[in-house]
Amino acid sequence: MKRVLNWMVLVLLLAGCSKPAPPPAASAEPEALSRTEFTKRVENFFEYEPLHSGKPSQVRIHLTDLSDGSPVENAVVTLGVRRTGSADSVVQTTSRVGKVTGIYVAELNVPSPGNYDIEFHIKNDKLDERMPLSNFKVE
């Protein structure tokens, strides 16, 4: 009996000496924000990295033509950024066409923190849509 008790104590001591599991590694990339907005002709689902002044943020834009449900092809997609309540554009950028039809990628670099509005202008042979959106916070 004494021998069994000694073995149990030894096993418990050895188990207590093991290292705890390391914490999971922190994600290097910030979590993307997303929104879905509509006009009468276009669905715009877009994802973007949190906006920080002076740092570029990628915007991934997924466009669908609501007249037939197809991806919006060969469009020029321009994003105009202005301070909330102002008519003057602070930044304007044109997206590049993504690898998949209907997906476009833009990079925004807003120079100073504050509240902003972004207007998406989507233009191709079939569409010429403007989509003014608000409630973008730049930190």
Predicted regions and their residues:
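Intrinsically disordered, low-complexity terminal tails/loops enriched in metal-binding residues
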Residues: 16-139
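Sec-dependent bacterial lipoprotein signal peptides
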Residues: 1-16
